[in-house]
Structure formats: C-alpha cells, structure tokens
C-alpha cells in the first residue's frame, strides 16, 4: 500500500488550470469583434479547410489580425502602461525605438483606414492559395526575426500599398513621403533626447561622486577630531590619576611617619615611666630597710639593758619579732 492511500484524491478534471490571462477570447471580441470560436455554417466542409491551411498562412492571418487590431484600436484611447511616444506596451518611454506610432495612424483619413480594414478582412476570408498571401507570409517570416515594431510597420506598409494600387499611386507616394519625414523627425528627437539624457546622467553621476567625496572627507575629518579628543581626554585622565596616586602616596607616607613617631613617643614615655617607677620602688625599699635596721638596732640596745630585768621570756619575744620582720622584708 502506498503511504498516501486514503488521503489524496484525484481531481474530477485532470487538467492544468489555466489563468484568465491566457483566455484571450474576450479580448479579441472586444478589440476587433472577431470571434475565433464562433459557429461556422454546416454547409462548408471543415476537413477541406483544415487540409488547405498551412502553418505559414495561419501565421500570416494572425499577423493580419494583429495589424487590424492596431489600426482600428479598442474603445480605450491608450493601453494601461503603454509608451507615450508610440502607444505600445512592453517598454518605457525613454526606451522607445519605434519610428511609427499609433497616434500617427489616428491622424490618417477615416476612408483610408476603412479601406485598409476591408482589404485585410478580404485577404483573411478569401483563402490562402494566392501568391500575394505567400509573399506576405515570406515577408512576415523575415520580419518575425526582428522586433514587433518592425513587423507592425511592414504590415501597415503592405496594407497601404494594396490600398494605393486600387485607388492610385499618388496617395501611396504622399503617405510614404510623410512617413519618411516623420521618421526623420522622430530619429532626430530620439537622438536629441538620448544625448540630453546622457548629459543629465553624467552630470548627476558627477554630482553624486563629488557629494560622496565631500561626505567621505567630512566623515574622515570628524573621525580624526574625535580620535584627537579621545587621546587628549585619556592623557588628562592619566595625568589626573598619576597626580592622585602621588598625593595618596604622600599622604600614606606622612601617616606612616606620624604613626612611627607616636609609637616612639609612647615607647619612650612607657620606658621613662617604668624607670621612674623602678627608681621609686628602689627608694622605698631602701627606706624600709633603713627603718628596719634602725629599729632593730634600737631594740637590740634596749634588750641588752633589760636582760637582767627580763628573763628568758623577753629574749624569746625579741627573737620572734626579729624573725617576723625578716620574713616581711623577704616578702617585699
């Protein structure tokens, strides 16, 4: 079983969808009133017509239809987006190289236009076996290699020649001379317009290049100025930072010196205080010792005098007192 079984359905009409742009039936019918899908009479055999027609003759009839459509024109005056010089679509106005325009065709006599239309229709209806149609087909094959504008001009010339043969060669000569004059004028105008356009383009290019150079030079100057300002700011910041660092180091050194001096002063004071306290203690000790010695001497003298009076008890007491005093001195 395929992977898409039961999901994809075939369309009812298995044909490629054609857009409305390809359906030109309405365009032909509104432009020249020609209906290619109109029903034909049952009396005329279709098979004989199809066998007699050749591809070259069908192409010639198609070109004739195009020429008729351009000569008669549609209800609208100008096609949408058409060239302003020649009135055709497919190029812009400054790109136009067509020597003939639809405006020139409108300036023709209405009788000549009607005669050209009738002759073209007769050529299409009569058939294909004539030599004139073969000449037209050969000329149109050569013209198919060139642009569409050349094809249109040649078809108009052929129609005008046929119409002129019927009514006279004077009208053909007049129309040909008028067309030549118009071609020359159009060529001169085209050359002038081309030269003017080229000069304008050169001027605009020069202006743009000069403007670009100026803008580039200005931008370079601005960048240089900005870089200089940045360098100056950086140098100032560095100088300020160096000065701040030097000031901080000086302050630190001063603080260190002051701390050292304070410590020295404190140590000196403590040393002096210690020495003073030690000397005072030594003096006190000496005074005590002197007092004790003096008291012991006085007691010894008193005890020697009173030996006779006092018995063994007094001597013992004096010994105890002397021992106590010695103990006190040793403790101190």
Swiss-Prot record:
Residues 41-54, 124-133, 154-163 have a biased composition (Basic and acidic residues). Residues 134-153, 241-250 have a biased composition (Acidic residues). Keywords: Metal-binding, Nucleus, Zinc, Zinc-finger. Pfam families: zf-CCHC_3. Induction: Slightly induced by Ca(2+). A zinc finger (CCHC-type) spans 81-98. GO terms for cellular component: cytoplasm; nucleus. This is CAX-interacting protein 4. It comes from Arabidopsis thaliana (Mouse-ear cress). The gene is CXIP4.
């Amino acid at each position: 079983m395929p992977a898409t079984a039961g999901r994809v359905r075939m369309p009812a009409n298995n044909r490629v969808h054609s857009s409305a742009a390809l359906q030109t039936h309405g365009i032909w019918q509104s432009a020249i009133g020609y209906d290619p899908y109109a029903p034909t009479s049952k009396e005329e055999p279709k098979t004989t017509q199809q066998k007699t027609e050749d591809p070259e003759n069908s192409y010639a009839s198609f070109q004739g239809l195009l020429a008729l459509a351009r000569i008669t024109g549609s209800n609208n005056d100008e096609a949408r987006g058409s060239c302003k010089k020649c009135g055709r679509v497919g190029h812009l106005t400054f790109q136009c190289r067509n020597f003939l325009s639809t405006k020139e065709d409108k300036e023709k006599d209405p009788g000549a236009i009607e005669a050209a239309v009738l002759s073209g229709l007769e050529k299409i209806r009569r058939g294909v076996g004539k030599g004139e149609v073969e000449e037209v087909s050969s000329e149109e094959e050569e013209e198919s290699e060139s642009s569409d504008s050349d094809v249109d001009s040649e078809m108009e010339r052929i129609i005008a020649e046929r119409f002129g043969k019927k009514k006279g060669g004077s009208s053909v000569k007049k129309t040909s001379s008028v067309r030549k004059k118009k071609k020359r004028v159009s060529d001169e105008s085209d050359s002038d317009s081309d030269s003017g356009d080229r000069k304008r383009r050169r001027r605009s290019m020069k202006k743009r290049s000069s403007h670009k150079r100026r803008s580039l030079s200005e931008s370079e100057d601005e960048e240089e100025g900005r870089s200089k300002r940045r360098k100056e700011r950086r140098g100032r910041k560095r100088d300020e930072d160096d000065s701040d660092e030097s000031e901080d180091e000086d302050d630190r050194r001063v603080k260190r010196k002051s701390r050292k001096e304070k410590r020295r002063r404190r140590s000196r004071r403590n040393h002096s205080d210690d020495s003073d306290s030690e000397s005072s203690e030594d003096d006190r000790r000496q005074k005590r010792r002197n007092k004790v010695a003096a008291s012991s001497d006085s007691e010894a003298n008193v005890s020697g005098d009173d030996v006779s009076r006092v018995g063994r008890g007094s001597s013992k007491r004096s010994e105890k007192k002397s021992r106590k005093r010695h103990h006190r001195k040793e403790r101190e």
